[in-house]
């Protein structure tokens, strides 16, 4: 390394190795921080005062050791400090010229600093004074504080937050809302971290570029190769860095650029600062010279500190004023010293910018990349499997080779944020590809920081830059800071994540937040930009049978939200080819195994790769996945299963390859149990449908969710309440169009599900069943009703979720929502906001009330954000890192806009809902009546039916769904659970007992179709339900009732047990919840809640929401507190439930449903079943799909508000149970009759199943019990059930409407009250203002009157005035009055109007008004030092005339303020008193000047002369300030003549002779000095200059008049 001066690095190294520092390093136990502080401060101030090279010898070392081996500060140093010379010198360098010249003494320096906002304070916050600094013996603490203040002043001059932000903007990006520094220290950390992140990015890019040719695991050793290459290519002096280079060669993969969290603690090794130096001065400070280790040793730290000091000495004017120990041990007392050094660095690099300062630019990387790209004209080669494997093994090791630059042009349709469009490839080594300069997610940095802290507890967590998690090891390139590394093999075209998520370090919260932002933030839209719709659809056919999933890599890290990477190319092998399938919009939720993903990644280096890098995604056992061989091969309806994410933690590691991770298609990608929402967030809904179809190869939509992906060609603008595909005639809402075309026709039709609740429930359920279904793929099967129905269901579900989660939508977009959000993002709708809102909602949802309200508030949100996203977001939110980095918080403005848009949509939706609700309510009433009659008849005829048997349910499911229910027991158990739950909760909420049974994908799809149809028909057919169906429903209901009764008895006894068993129950509970959600009525959905410990689960909130949905239905979305509480309670027990949904892949032991879980289909089946139940119940309850058409339209309105809560809950459970219930839509219409709504509180028969139900109900109802009696849905005769459900639904809707109206009324009342208060306050304010104005006007009139009279008197004086002004009688009166006024202390106060304002001063003499005794002079007292200006007095100041001396004259009619008061008050009318001060002079002579027996003769003679004279104004002459009477003079204001009347003194007094003027205060009987130099009528006495007195001249008795 050769510095600017030409000295070699070796020389510097030798110099640094000089014995003093190297050998004499003070060990920590002997290091004296206090001494070090004194030495550092003194060295700094001396260097600044004299210049480092000109410091006097005796000051260079401030310490000396005496004969007793005691160390002391040298006397010259102490003398300098006490003299303030050093301080003045240094301070003058900071101040401007004029100010600097005035610096004399410590006080002036302290004041100068305080003017700059810097206060000299000791450590105990006591201010340092001049006395402290001048104190002898010296008080070092005060002087250290002074030096610290000067250092801070220097620091402020050299660096500021604005300068730092401006500097960082040039090479990086940051989140203004989250990362803006709040003080100078934070600004320094911010700057250093940003530079280090930039260096990470640069070095990672360099390494990738160098290693790009390597596709073998060898690329994992870039550090070694780099070091070798560097050493070979660069003629660097080896001597300096032999040791370090050796380390490079031996073990170093890449330099680790640390990120600081604490300036002193984290910066003490010098690595971060050296990285900054290298960034700005790459030639002077070689990167290889710096020891950049993640965990540097002390030797490394010393090496770095020496290097830093050497650089400072050589290039920065020796600004490093610390010792090695100071920097190494970094005691807090030295923080000001370190800060001033960093400020100086910043100043040199950003302000001075010497020639050697040449910041590294990314351009060099770009150039290198260009070269590399030119090298290979062919599109980037897909990453080899070996490379992928190696990458999977250690993502960090991934080399650029693995991530070939995406030469593939972005599809025109893909509007990606190319943070670095030119740098799409993931940076191996955990280098985050996003350059700080490219804002991925502005807010992510902080979030990343949090997530990093969580994720990488062992790492030093430094504030993350946008690009990467601070604490993340550079070696790991993780797109998402999931705890798992994900392969970054695929460079994502998605510039948003900038080079595939691999950019981000494994711990990089940025990546995570990016993914999050995708789901939550408008960034999602960016991702979506790449959606097929946006991107050109090269070929309609699916590419390589890969569905969008190939483009979208979704992985759910336990905490990581979905990491959906949308690839531009569908074809794994032709990355350069944009997704060919026009259906690309269809998202295949199928999950690829990591290998699959890797292949896909390889194939699509350019495609978006948001999926978090995971070490190797564990493939859940196939047995646990609901994946058929067909699905795996992509032949079946691979329902893009969002591998349901473990309930936020219940089974975080379980990843389902929903679609058969092992399949050859991308769909097989291992799917981390990403909540549907997560999955959706990453997946573009538009891509989902068509793509999934492609992926399937059959064009069948993966059962991802009933998302009807937006038509391939069109971008899903967002979820639309409009029944895109819904056949309103049938009263069914098609969330997804049944056919691809329908999908196209309706971009995301109503997804009723509460984003949040659905997200949670649906996430779980769908993740299990639909996991992929709902969110991921609603691929449209070109004519498949199933897919359409599923999509419809999903949409309905999402609508409900929206209602519930609309508020929550932002927290988690349901998968569909996420997809849609992504698509919407691309399209225009910002799902991000939904996701964010959903997240917020979940958080509040956890508070529950917020969930329902928020969602209701934003129906669109739910649509746009199905529950899965919510879950995903919730997880993130719950995890601190997530929260901090949540993109939601990131784009505040964007969110605000989204919120506004959502609000508008919500209003429109609510209006529509109201209409639909009215229709559905009427329909329900009719159906309810019919059902009731049927039930009554049936009940009489049949008597109490026997408890439903699992087989019975199964049959019903089969019948209704037209599908075989694999687990009838599941239903029954779920039903029983519901019953028990009802009993336990005594909640009136309808719980859907039907459990989803695992089904074959086809079956599920069919079931979904049927369900959709049945649900859709339910509403329509509810009225048309055959009597037979009603009878069947009634029979079932009766059986259910008996069962429930039995169950209730057991439940009462086993509540505790049930709660403990709840984990098993939860699944059914979840299903029930889903059903409940759909029920929408008091239906409280028992959604499996994540264990209390599972923060990620939103379900509990949803439950609350579900219950509250109706309540919350009003835009207020307020969840009844009891419900919220109940939700919370249910949450707690629900954890097991929620866990179950998540653990759909959990062993059967968990739940009756669990048996299904092993196959992974059970959840789906259960979901379907529950969905069927929903559909069946929806016939009456919330067939989300069917009810949604008629009911949903109206209910969506209501539900979104009411159901939003209840649906959120229900959907939480139902989505968990039904996997978004939409998935179950396959069930035949028959299912509608299979459910019967039963008041859980009515059922009392304990039953084995009842226990199960009880468990679930205890979970579910635990929250509900407070809310409402639980109503359970049981499979009964479809007709009867429908009737019951219709009635209950109608009643529930009416109840919700009433509640909403009441809430609105309350709200309006509150608003009216608030408005009244405001009006009252405004009125009072107006009255006060008017009163003040009137007072002002009155005063002005008085003043004008006074001036007029004054003028008139002046005229009279000139002419006739004297005789009138002379009257003695008025004069005495005025005197008396004045005296009385002054005595009262409120002379002028006597005049209420004018004096009221002036009285403050009028009561006192002008001087006395100040009430400063010192100023006032008693006749015999000592002169007062304080001068009160009359003008300062209120009266005088108030009078505009005051500006002239005349003012004094006017006021001087009475020399005291009393006299002034006279003018303002009634005394104004006494012209004599106003123009003559004779009474005042009379009083002064009598009571002050010549008081007492001794002076009586003299006094009498003086008074006689006074009475004889006709003059208006008199002046007393004093000898001096002692106020010793000498003579009485007459004063003519017109001529300003003062001539002697009697006494000893000059015959006349001129202006020049006057020394001081006094005014007499009659009340205080003393003279007060007037701060004026000119005579006026207000003056009562004066003194002349001392030299005018002749000592010989005899004087009047010289008895000093003491001031009274």
Swiss-Prot record:
The keyword Coiled coil applies. Keywords: Coiled coil, Cytoplasm, Cytoskeleton, Microtubule, Phosphoprotein. It is found in: Cytoplasm, Cytoskeleton. In brain, specifically expressed in astrocytes (at protein level). Signal peptide: none annotated. Residues 890-926, 1026-1058, 1286-1357 form a coiled coil. Residues 784-806, 874-886, 1113-1124, 1246-1258, 1298-1348 have a biased composition (Basic and acidic residues). Residues 813-824, 847-858, 1395-1412 have a biased composition (Low complexity). GO terms for cellular component: cytoplasm; microtubule; microtubule minus-end. Residues 1465-1599 form the CKK domain. GO terms for molecular function: calmodulin binding; microtubule binding; microtubule minus-end binding; spectrin binding. Residues 1363-1374 have a biased composition (Basic residues). One of its GO terms (biological process) is regulation of microtubule polymerization. The modification Phosphotyrosine is found at residue 1539. The modification Phosphoserine is found at residues 216, 390, 394, 435, 571, 574, 581, 593, 607, 647, 739, 745, 755, 757, 1090, 1154, 1400, 1429. Residues 235-350 form the Calponin-homology (CH) domain. The modification Phosphothreonine is found at residue 531. Belongs to the CAMSAP1 family. Key microtubule-organizing protein that specifically binds the minus-end of non-centrosomal microtubules and regulates their dynamics and organization. Specifically recognizes growing microtubule minus-ends and stabilizes microtubules. Acts on free microtubule minus-ends that are not capped by microtubule-nucleating proteins or other factors and protects microtubule minus-ends from depolymerization. This is Calmodulin-regulated spectrin-associated protein 1. It comes from Rattus norvegicus (Rat). The lineage of its organism: Eukaryota, Metazoa, Chordata, Craniata, Vertebrata. The gene is Camsap1.
């Amino acid at each position: 390394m050769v510095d600017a001066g030409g000295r070699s690095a070796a020389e510097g190294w030798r110099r640094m190795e000089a014995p003093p520092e190297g050998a004499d390093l003070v060990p920590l136990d002997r290091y004296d921080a206090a001494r070090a502080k004194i030495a550092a401060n003194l060295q700094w101030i001396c260097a600044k005062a004299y210049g480092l090279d000109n410091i006097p010898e005796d000051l260079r070392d401030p310490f000396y050791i005496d004969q007793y081996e005691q160390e002391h500060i040298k006397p010259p140093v102490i003398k300098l400090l006490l003299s303030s010379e050093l301080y003045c010198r240094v301070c003058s360098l900071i101040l401007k010229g004029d100010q600097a010249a005035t610096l004399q003494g410590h006080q002036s320096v302290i004041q100068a600093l305080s003017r700059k906002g810097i206060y000299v304070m000791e450590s105990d916050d006591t201010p340092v004074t001049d006395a402290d600094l001048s104190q002898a013996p010296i008080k070092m603490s005060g002087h250290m504080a002074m030096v610290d203040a000067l250092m801070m002043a220097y620091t402020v001059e050299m660096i500021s937050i604005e300068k730092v932000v401006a500097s960082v903007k040039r090479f990086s990006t940051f989140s203004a809302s989250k990362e803006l520094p709040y003080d100078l220290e934070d600004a320094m950390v911010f700057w250093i971290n940003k530079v280090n992140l930039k260096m990470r990015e640069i070095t990672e890019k360099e390494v990738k570029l160098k290693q790009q040719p390597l596709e073998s695991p060898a690329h994992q050793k870039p550090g070694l190769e780099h070091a070798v290459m560097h050493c070979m290519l660069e003629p660097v002096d080896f001597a300096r860095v032999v040791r370090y280079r050796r380390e490079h060669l031996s073990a170093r993969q890449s330099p680790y650029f640390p990120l600081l969290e604490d300036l002193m603690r984290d910066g003490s090794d010098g690595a971060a600062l050296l990285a900054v130096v290298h960034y700005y001065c790459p030639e002077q400070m070689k990167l290889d010279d710096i020891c950049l280790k993640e965990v540097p040793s002390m030797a490394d730290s010393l090496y770095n500190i020496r290097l830093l000091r050497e650089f400072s000495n050589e290039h920065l004017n020796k600004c490093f004023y610390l010792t090695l120990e100071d920097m190494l041990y970094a005691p807090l007392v030295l923080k000001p010293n370190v800060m001033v050094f960093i400020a100086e660095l910043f100043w040199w690099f950003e302000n001075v910018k010497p020639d050697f300062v040449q910041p590294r630019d990314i351009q060099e990387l770009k150039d290198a990349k260009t070269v590399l790209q030119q090298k290979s004209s062919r599109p980037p080669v897909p990453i080899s499997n070996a490379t992928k494997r190696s990458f999977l093994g250690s993502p960090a090791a991934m080399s650029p080779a693995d991530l070939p630059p995406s030469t593939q042009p972005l599809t025109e349709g893909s509007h990606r944020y190319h943070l670095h469009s030119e740098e799409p490839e993931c940076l191996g080594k955990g280098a985050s590809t996003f350059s700080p300069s490219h804002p991925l997610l502005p807010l992510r940095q902080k979030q990343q920081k949090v997530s990093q802290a969580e994720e990488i507890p062992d790492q030093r967590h430094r504030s993350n830059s946008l690009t990467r998690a601070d604490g993340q090891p550079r070696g790991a390139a993780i797109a998402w800071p999931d705890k798992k590394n994900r392969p970054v093999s695929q460079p994502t075209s998605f510039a948003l994540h900038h080079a595939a998520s691999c950019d981000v370090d494994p711990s990089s919260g940025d990546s995570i937040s990016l993914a999050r932002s995708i789901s939550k933030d408008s960034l999602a839209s960016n991702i979506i930009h790449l959606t097929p719709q946006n991107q050109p659809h090269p070929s309609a056919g699916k590419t390589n049978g890969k569905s969008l999933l190939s483009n979208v890599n979704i992985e759910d890290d336990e905490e990581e939200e979905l990491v959906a990477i949308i690839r531009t190319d569908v074809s794994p092998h032709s990355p350069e080819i944009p997704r060919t399938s026009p259906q690309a919009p269809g998202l295949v939720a199928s999950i690829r195994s990591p290998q699959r993903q890797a292949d896909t990644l390889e194939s699509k280096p350019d495609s978006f790769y948001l999926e978090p890098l995971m070490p190797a995604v564990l493939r859940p056992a196939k047995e646990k996945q609901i994946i058929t061989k067909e699905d795996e091969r992509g032949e079946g309806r691979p329902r893009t299963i969002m591998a349901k994410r473990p309930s936020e933690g219940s089974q975080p590691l379980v990843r389902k390859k929903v679609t058969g991770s092992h399949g050859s298609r991308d769909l097989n990608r291992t799917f981390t149990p990403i909540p549907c929402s997560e999955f959706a967030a990453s997946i573009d809904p538009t891509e989902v449908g068509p793509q999934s179809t492609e992926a399937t190869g059959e064009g069948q939509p993966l059962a991802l969710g009933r998302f009807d992906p937006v038509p391939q060609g069109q971008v899903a603008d967002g979820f639309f309440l409009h029944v895109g595909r819904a056949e309103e005639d049938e009263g069914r809402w098609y969330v997804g169009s049944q056919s691809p075309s329908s999908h196209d026709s309706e971009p995301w039709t109503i997804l009723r599900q509460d984003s949040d609740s659905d997200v949670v429930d649906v996430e779980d359920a769908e993740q299990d069943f639909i996991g992929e279904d709902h969110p991921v793929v609603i691929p449209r099967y070109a004519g498949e009703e199933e897919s359409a129905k599923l999509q419809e269901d999903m949409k309905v579900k999402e609508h409900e979720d929206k209602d519930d989660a609309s508020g929550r939508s932002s927290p988690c977009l349901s998968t569909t929502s996420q997809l849609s959000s992504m698509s919407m993002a691309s399209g225009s709708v910002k799902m991000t906001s939904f996701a964010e809102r959903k997240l917020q909602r979940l958080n509040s949802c956890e508070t529950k009330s917020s969930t329902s309200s928020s969602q209701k508030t934003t129906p669109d949100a739910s649509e746009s954000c199905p529950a899965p996203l919510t879950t995903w977001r919730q997880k993130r939110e719950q995890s601190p890192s997530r929260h901090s980095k949540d993109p939601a918080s990131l784009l505040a403005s964007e969110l605000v806009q989204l919120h506004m848009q959502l609000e508008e949509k919500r209003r429109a939706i609510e209006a529509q809902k109201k209409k639909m609700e009215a229709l559905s309510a009427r329909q329900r009433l009719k159906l309810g009546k019919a059902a009731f009659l049927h039930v009554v008849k049936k009940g009489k005829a049949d008597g109490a039916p026997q408890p439903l048997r699992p087989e019975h349910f199964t049959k019903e499911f089969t019948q209704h769904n037209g599908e075989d229910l694999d687990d009838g027991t599941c239903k029954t158990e779920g039903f029983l659970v519901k019953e028990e739950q009802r009993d336990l909760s005594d909640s009136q909420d309808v719980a859907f007992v039907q459990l989803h049974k695992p089904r074959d994908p086809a079956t599920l799809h069919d079931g979904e179709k049927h369900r959709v149809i049945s649900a859709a028909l339910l509403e329509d057919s509810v009225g048309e339900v055959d009597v037979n169906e009603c009878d069947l429903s009634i029979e079932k209901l009766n059986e259910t009732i008996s069962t429930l009764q039995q169950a209730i008895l057991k439940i009462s006894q086993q509540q505790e047990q049930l709660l403990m068993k709840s984990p098993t129950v939860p699944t059914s509970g979840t299903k029930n919840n889903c059903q409940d959600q759909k029920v929408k009525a008091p239906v409280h959905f028992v959604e499996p809640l994540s264990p209390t410990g599972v923060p990620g689960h939103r379900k509990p909130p949803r439950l609350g929401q579900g219950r509250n949905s109706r309540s919350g239905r009003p835009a207020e979305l307020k969840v009844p507190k009891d419900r919220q509480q109940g939700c919370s309670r249910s949450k707690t027990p629900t954890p097991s439930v929620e866990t179950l949904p998540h653990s759909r892949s959990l062993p059967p032991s968990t739940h009756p449903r669990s048996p299904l879980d092993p196959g992974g289909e059970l959840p789906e089946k259960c979901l379907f079943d529950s969905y069927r139940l929903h559909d069946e119940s929806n016939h009456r309850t919330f067939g989300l799909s069917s009810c949604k058409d008629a009911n949903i339209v109206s209910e969506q309105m209501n539900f979104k508000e009411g159901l939003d809560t209840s649906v959120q809950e229900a959907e939480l459970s139902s989505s968990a149970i039904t996997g978004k219930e939409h998935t179950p839509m396959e069930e035949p219409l028959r299912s509608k009759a299979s459910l019967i709504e039963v008041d859980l509180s009515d059922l009392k028969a304990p039953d084995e199943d009842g226990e199960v139900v009880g468990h679930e109900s205890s979970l579910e109802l635990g929250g509900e019990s407070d809310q409402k009696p639980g109503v359970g849905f049981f499979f009964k005769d479809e007709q009867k059930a429908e009737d019951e459900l219709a009635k209950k639904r109608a009643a529930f809707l009416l109840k919700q409407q009433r509640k909403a109206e009441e809430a609105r009324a309350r709200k309006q009342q509150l608003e009216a009250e608030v408005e009244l208060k405001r009006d009252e306050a405004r009125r009072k304010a107006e009255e006060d203002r008017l009163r003040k104005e009137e007072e002002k006007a009155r005063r002005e009139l008085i003043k004008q009157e006074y001036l007029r009279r004054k003028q008139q008197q002046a005229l009279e004086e000139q002419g006739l005035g004297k005789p009138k002004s002379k009257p003695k009688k008025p004069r005495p009166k005025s005197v008396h009055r004045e005296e009385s006024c002054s005595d009262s202390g409120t002379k002028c106060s006597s005049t209420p109007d004018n004096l009221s304002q002036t009285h403050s001063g009028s009561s006192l003499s002008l001087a006395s008004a100040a009430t400063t005794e010192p100023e006032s002079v008693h006749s015999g007292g000592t002169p007062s030092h304080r001068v009160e200006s009359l003008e300062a007095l209120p009266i005088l100041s108030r009078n505009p005339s005051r500006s002239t001396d005349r003012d004094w004259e006017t006021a001087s009619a009475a020399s005291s303020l009393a006299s002034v008061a006279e003018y303002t008050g009634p005394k104004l009318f006494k012209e004599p008193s106003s123009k003559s001060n004779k009474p005042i002079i009379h009083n002064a002579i009598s009571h002050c000047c010549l008081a007492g027996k001794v002076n009586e003769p003299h006094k009498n003679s003086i008074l006689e002369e006074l009475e004889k004279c006709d003059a208006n104004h008199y002046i007393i002459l004093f000898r001096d300030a002692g106020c010793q009477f000498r003579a009485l003079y007459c004063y003519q204001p017109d001529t300003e003549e003062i001539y002697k009347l009697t006494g000893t003194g000059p015959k006349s007094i001129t202006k020049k002779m006057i020394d001081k003027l006094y005014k007499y205060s009659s009340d205080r009987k003393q003279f007060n000095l007037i701060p004026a130099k000119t005579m006026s009528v207000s003056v009562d006495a004066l003194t002349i200059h001392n030299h005018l007195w002749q000592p010989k001249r005899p004087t009047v008795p010289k008895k000093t008049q003491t001031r009274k």
